[in-house]
Amino acid sequence: RPPGFTPFRIY
């Protein structure tokens, strides 16, 4: 994951 990425639709 890139830095500052918000885990929103992580399956």
Swiss-Prot record:
Family under the similarity heading: Belongs to the bradykinin-related peptide family.
Descriptive protein name: [Thr6]-phyllokinin
Subcellular localization: Secreted
Major localization class: secreted
Keyword Nuclease among record annotations: no
Organism: Physalaemus nattereri (Cuyaba dwarf frog)
Transmembrane segments: none
Any one Gene Ontology BP term: defense response
Tissue-wise expression: Expressed by the skin glands.
Reported function: May produce in vitro relaxation of rat arterial smooth muscle and constriction of intestinal smooth muscle. May target bradykinin receptors (BDKRB).
KW Secreted (keyword) present: yes
